[in-house]
């Protein structure tokens, strides 16, 4: 009896061991097949992805002409954003031919010869500093020039004006003598440049219908300008000067130089002109708008001979008829500065030849006559 019991126990144990081995074998087979299936699927996906990647075209794979056409359509902020994509695109996006269009569109009207010369002088000064510091840095450890360039952040205007914040400043660094760097310095107000301001000091009555030289810089937050006027004594300043009140500085005549009047013999009644005027000889000239009038003995209708007279009447019709500032008379021949300490000094004259110049002045006309 006892022998039969031991035989039964041995048989059950053998069956259990066999069952366990069978289950283990099945489990290993399932796991092995599962891993093999997963590996196959992953490999298939990888091959498919590689195939798709091979079929995709990169922007840099485009012909140069096509890529340039695309980049030319981008705004300044978009061009700046593209510089952070890769070095190849950065080199393309900082090229002058892409930025010249943006410069001309926004800043061309104000970039006269004087402003351009000012920028060239500014760049030359920076380049001299960099060259000098580069040579001196070879003798000492600190590389001042590299720190200087690294701290040039000309695209600060992007963060608040164009939504390009959180981009590394190094990706925006452009060559100092590039149009992109020039544009960026104008945009962020780093560069003061010469221009002329109509109706200075917020349209102060003493400057209505005049235009004065100033140094200006842009404020991108308000889309207006700050202006500093050069004068005898205190230096006047003004904020929130609009685009409409600005024109490029005239490089041919400095604010303290007498303009050569080569138009006097051709002036006729009704012609529009600008004339230099200053309060005293210590002050710089401003340009004042006027209209050629008739002589006192002419009725302005019949037998008018004002155009052949040796004198020419300069009228400033923004003033009341009884105002001492209403008119002055100058000689056509050998005209020099004329005037006195009471009424100021009149300088050179230039005739306005385009309708655009005349309409600009008329838009600034005061709402009521001045005293």
Swiss-Prot record:
This is F-box protein At2g41170. It comes from Arabidopsis thaliana (Mouse-ear cress). Residues 56-102 form the F-box domain. The lineage of its organism: Eukaryota, Viridiplantae, Streptophyta, Embryophyta, Tracheophyta. PROSITE patterns: FBOX. SUPFAM superfamilies: F-box domain.
